[in-house]
A protein has these predicted regions:
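Short, small-residue-biased leader/transition segments that mark boundaries at the very start
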Residues: 3-4
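Catalytic micro-motifs at enzyme active sites that drive phosphoryl/nucleotidyl and oxygen chemistry
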Residues: 11-17
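Flexible helix-coil linker/hinge segments at domain or subdomain boundaries
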Residues: 17-19, 50-67, 150-165
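Aromatic/basic-lined ligand-recognition segments
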Residues: 39-130
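Modules that initiate DNA replication and primer synthesis
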Residues: 111-222
Length: 222
């Protein structure tokens, strides 16, 4: 975290400013990714993007133009590709038949998870984070992108199913963070920042009164 503090402090001293019109983009090295892992990354984003955008409090104007959600028809086609598909085939599906990998400002770059960046410069890009000069939030954003990237690489398969925003979104998203491996004191501050915009009880899915064992324990302690 000290590294992030020094870097953010350097930006501030250089005159950096942020506002609601701009975002923070996180690039992750894509050299370890395969067509299957990129398919996984898109599927994870599709599944979690509704609650993710709520957790990140993404500016609606940015969502409409600069960090759109996953294109469902495109993902459906990519998920139907055979497991041994090539990167060239995946690239054609991402660009919907053409090859825009040589274009800096190709239209497919304006998505929360940007695979154009993979084909253009070799990095997987997340564009959904709000701009900030808070070192803790910067670290949380980068850590989340790295964790999703790692899960996409390590996971053998994924499903294309939206995660519903339940009556307790804080618990739902915390569960996702724990499944990504963001567990323990090392990631406590990361979880705090990523959960700060979500209502609900982070530790309990339902009202504590609905758990008989917990109620019995309380009665015994009286």
């Amino acid at each position: 975290s000290d590294v992030y503090k020094r870097q953010v402090r350097t930006l501030r001293h250089a005159g950096a400013v942020v506002n609601s019109s701009c975002g923070m983009h996180v690039h992750v090295d894509a050299s370890k990714h395969t067509p299957q892992s990129l398919k996984n990354a898109l599927s994870i984003m599709y599944s979690k993007e509704d609650i993710l955008f709520k957790a990140l409090n993404v500016n609606e104007h940015r969502v409409e133009r600069w960090c759109q959600k996953v294109r469902e028809p495109m993902l459906e086609k990519i998920r139907k590709l055979p497991t041994n598909t090539t990167m060239d085939r995946l690239r054609r599906e991402w660009y919907e038949g053409s090859d825009g990998s040589y274009e800096h400002y190709n239209w497919t770059r304006y998505y929360a998870l940007n695979l154009h960046s993979v084909f253009y410069r070799g990095t997987l890009e997340w564009r959904c984070f709000e701009s900030t000069l808070h070192a803790g939030k910067v670290r949380a954003n980068i850590t989340l992108a790295l964790a999703i990237s790692a899960q996409a690489i390590n996971q053998s398969r994924t499903v294309m199913r939206k995660t519903e925003i339940s009556e307790n979104p804080a618990f739902t998203f915390r569960t996702f963070l724990l499944r990504l491996g963001l567990i323990g004191p090392e990631y406590k501050n990361v979880r705090e920042h990523l959960l700060s915009n979500l209502p609900g009880d982070r530790a309990w899915r339902y009202d504590k009164a609905q758990y008989p064992s917990l109620q019995n324990r309380r009665n015994q302690e009286r």
